[in-house]
């Protein structure tokens, strides 16, 4: 969906919404077959192609644009342009797999976890006595896991939280002489984070392999859980959550 309008005074406004429900049988970027096998999340047989959520794209995405130019000077040959872009989106699909090879397919990375009920946790064999309670608490604070107790996690069925970001651009164009002009620009990416360090932050999964598993000679699993794992999401501290500024200078002739 998209709506846009240019007003008589030169103001341009645009707003749009995209919805995506994409599925595939393999979302892994792999140059060799072994990686495609080892990293593609599965329930049982990695050689069996199963249609499931694709990891790519945002499920919901709202965008908005506002731009305005002012012409002035002799013969209105100088132009100042100010524009902004805003995005609000929910995407970042991910899944939960065991830290271990529970299905004996040779990969410790691709086995989707079973989300146990409270009573089932009490019947599981854990490596330490506190693991059961810590796993119970972790499941209960996670909306996706809590909603799928007694079922397996879906391939890329979980979504990261909503994120919002605004970019701002300033352009000053100066005409120097016939067919010659100088343009100076400033881009501020994630402008909200410049105004407030708590704005424009992106959250990411804290751990996508929350449950460890080892199989003994008799085929019985022993589970483990990291006691330091309290919450599903943490803030991404890289540049994606930080404001950035860049300058541009262009001479046209």
What are these language model-derived features?
Residues 22-25, 89-97, 191-198:
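Secretory-pathway/luminal and periplasmic proteins that interact with or process carbohydrate-rich
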């Amino acid at each position: 969906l998209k709506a846009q309008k240019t007003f008589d005074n030169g103001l341009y406004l645009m707003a749009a919404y995209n919805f995506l429900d994409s599925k595939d049988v393999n979302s892994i970027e792999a140059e060799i077959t072994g990686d495609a096998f080892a990293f593609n999340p599965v329930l049982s047989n990695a050689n069996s192609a199963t249609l499931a959520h694709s990891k790519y794209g945002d499920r919901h995405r709202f965008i908005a644009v506002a731009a305005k130019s002012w012409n002035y000077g002799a013969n209105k040959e100088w132009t100042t342009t100010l524009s902004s872009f805003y995005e609000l989106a929910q995407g970042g699909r991910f899944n939960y797999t065991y830290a271990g090879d529970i299905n004996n397919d040779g990969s410790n990375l691709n086995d989707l976890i079973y989300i146990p009920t409270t009573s089932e946790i009490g019947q599981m064999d854990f490596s330490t006595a506190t693991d059961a309670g810590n796993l119970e608490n972790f499941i209960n604070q996670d909306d996706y896991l809590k909603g799928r107790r007694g079922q397996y996690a879906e391939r890329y069925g979980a979504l990261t939280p909503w994120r919002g970001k605004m970019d701002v651009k300033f352009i000053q164009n100066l005409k120097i002489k016939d067919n010659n002009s100088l343009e100076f620009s400033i881009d501020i990416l994630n402008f909200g984070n410049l105004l407030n360090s708590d704005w424009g932050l992106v959250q990411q999964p804290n751990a996508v392999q929350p449950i460890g598993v080892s199989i003994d000679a008799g085929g019985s699993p022993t589970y483990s859980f990291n006691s330091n794992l309290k919450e599903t999401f943490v803030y991404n501290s890289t540049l994606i959550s930080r404001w950035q500024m860049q300058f541009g200078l262009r001479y046209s002739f």
